[in-house]
Amino acid sequence: MVEVSGLAVVTVPMFVRENFGDDGVEKWLSKLEPDVREIYKSSISVNKWFDIQKVFIRPTELLCNLFYKGDFKAAWQFGRFSADYGLRGVLRVFVKMGSVNYFIRRASVVIPNYYTPMTMEVPTNEKGFAVLQIPHFPGIHRLVEYRIGGWMERALEITGKSKELSVEMTKSLADGDDCTEYQVRWS
């Protein structure tokens, strides 16, 4: 079974509340399966693991349908929000201390802490350009790929070390490619 960390799950209702208010949260919660609704209404442990389909993908799909006219690219914004949440306080200072290349190396270790089983590799990491790949993630969904891309984009912005930053997803396991690939460019 593929699982998602509570650290990723806890940010979903936070994102809804910040962007659509309490009414948006209630509208979203009312459409969830009862057992999933109870998870989201409770205090979510960031150390707990959840079934990715039931507790993460379907609720995120619902968010996209309710508030973004079904556009899965909204998950990119969820990822950005998650980076702001996860990289705050002392971690934000730590992120700002390293170079972009250092952070990209670390991202390949950090991101797999959100999803299991998965692997992430960095086959290219040079000045101004890097490639990150996910060669193994059983049943990955496009929503997860977008969320990871948005997380990386925002995390790299937080470093404050790059200008003209772009993160582009160039391959997709969900679409049948041999890996999910992100190309990162900066100056």
Across the structure, where does each feature detected by a protein language model lie?
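Short, non-transmembrane amphipathic alpha-helical segments
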Residues: Y146-G160
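A broad structural signal for alpha-helix termini and local helix breaks/kinks
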Residues: F20, L32, F67-Y68, I111, ...
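N-terminal leader/assembly segments
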Residues: M1-K69
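Amphipathic interaction/junction segments at domain boundaries or subunit interfaces
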Residues: V46-R147, E164-L165, K171
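Beta-rich nucleic-acid/ligand-interaction surfaces
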Residues: L165-R185
